[in-house]
Amino acid sequence: MQIITIFGATGNQGSSVARSLLRNRSFEVRCITRNAESKKAQLLKAQGAVIVEADGYDTSQIQQAFSGSWGAFVNTNGDDPSLASENRTDRDLGLSIIRGAAAAGVKHLVYSSGPWAAKLSGGACSVPSNDAKAEVQHVAQGLGFETVTPIMPGWFFETFLEPQMAAIFGGFPVTPDEEGWLTCRAPLWGGREHVPFLSVDNDFGDIVHGVFLNPVRWNLRPIQAISDFLSFADFVNTYVSLTGKKARFVALSSPMEMETMGHPLLESIRGFFIFSQLRDGEYFGTGPTEKETATALKQAAHRAQANDRKGEQAALTSARDFLQARFGNSK
């Protein structure tokens, strides 16, 4: 049985990967966490994962945690405020982890990355959280792994359900504005307005799972991890068609109209729009936004989990699917 070890296993991405892999009996799933007694870690343990504790900045601990692993999925949170408070960076953390994994003899690395905005824009803009990940990805490709696959997540559908995130964009679909509308206020994405959306809960883990089923096929191939693409306006209109509620999209004339208050996460979000507009909406830096690759990978994972997923659909989660599941009965 091949061991796949996940760093960041209790986060949105890592837990999705763990859940998907645990449904394939060909893999043993090991999850690295800072606190093995946390509720999220204990839930993964109850589902069959092996839980190990390690400090991501301690390469020797990380090497031990990855020992014996055939594959690794690594995600770090570049917008984690604790990094700044500890005078550390996401780049430092990522480098420590991948070096520990390489030293442990991991063969196949799937790394949650992002487009290198500073490089792809010729220095015209920077998205520090993505740029740091892209730098770590570049280093990983020279560390002796047999394969390295960068996977680039799209915009999580699930963030619309978080009140704090909804408030950043005007309140949609959580809190009405002073005029009684559920308003989504954001800059345009650019180009054909193909905003790459992802259901991290439903699809991301399966997409990563699909890579591990044939890692040589996906070596050095940046993966667009998306579930659907459409404009913010169409997303809001889909919500209206399902719920009948008053909702609207209001386009900002420029990303610079977004208030960030110096917060790293908000600065990154504004940077996404600046970068995407510079690239005419081709956010991933690998060509037009597409979901054929993600579809093929999810279908491969579904086949590998056949005993556990009889009767389930292998399709990606469309915007309508996502909104129907959360709001479809509110009309």
Curated annotation (Swiss-Prot):
GO (cellular component) term, any one: nucleus
Name of the molecule in the record: NmrA-like family domain-containing oxidoreductase himF
Sequence positions that bind NADP(+): 8-13, 34-38, 55-56, 76-78, 133, 155-167
UniProt keywords, alphabetically: NADP, Oxidoreductase
Top-level class of the enzyme under EC nomenclature: oxidoreductase
GO molecular function, a single term: oxidoreductase activity
Record's signal peptide: none
Top-level taxon: Eukaryota
Pathway: Secondary metabolite biosynthesis
Family recorded in the similarity comment: Belongs to the NmrA-type oxidoreductase family.
